Amino acid sequence: MSSFNNIGQAIILCGGKGTRLAPISGNIIPKSLIKIGRYPFIYYLINQIYSLGIKRIILCTGYLSELIYTDLNNFNFRNNNIFEFVFSNEDTPLGTAGALIKAFPLLKNHSSIIFNGDTYIKGNLKSYINKETSSNISMLTSFKYFSKDFGVTYCSKNNLLE
């Protein structure tokens, strides 16, 4: 059973090249650093993580990872002692599962919440996490009537992953 109070760290998957966003990023910045309004997208994720009371963030980086590191330093996230940032950098793209496997040795002995570095979840994450569940892992997805070549999950009528 998961409980929000057991979550001691967040993982942000931000190692992708963002080829679909090349017209916006120009392939010169990682997609998590593309500005939405005044700030890079990753700042909104970090603030959401902060609102959950989580202070340890593992960043699974890859493409242009040094820019993410520098940007977080420049914005003073790393120097204000609010967060402990830990970087797990992929020298070659490993995909989602590969990034998580590479970061596994960095995990401390408590539950984690994983965020995609290009996805913002609007809503009350605390209530979702605290919801009674009989499994050791949960995944929050959204229902769409269309599918793409990426980010698709298939569920049975019982809402179990197929």
Question: Which role fits each region the language model picked out?
Answer:
Residues N27-Y43:
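Short catalytic helix/loop segments, enriched in acidic residues and glycine
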Residues L72, I121-E162:
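Conserved core of the sugar-phosphate nucleotidyltransferase
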Residues F4, N27, S51, L106-N109, ...:
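Alpha-helix termination/capping residues and helix-transition junctions
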Residues L33, E84-F87, I137-M139:
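Conserved beta-strand scaffold positions in the cores of enzyme catalytic domains, especially
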Residues M1-N27:
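N-terminal nucleotide-binding beta1-loop-alpha1 segment
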Residues S2-I12, Y39-N116, L125-S127:
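Conserved N-terminal catalytic core of the sugar/cofactor nucleotidyltransferase
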Residues K17, F115-T119, F143:
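Active-site metal-binding loops of divalent metal-dependent hydrolases
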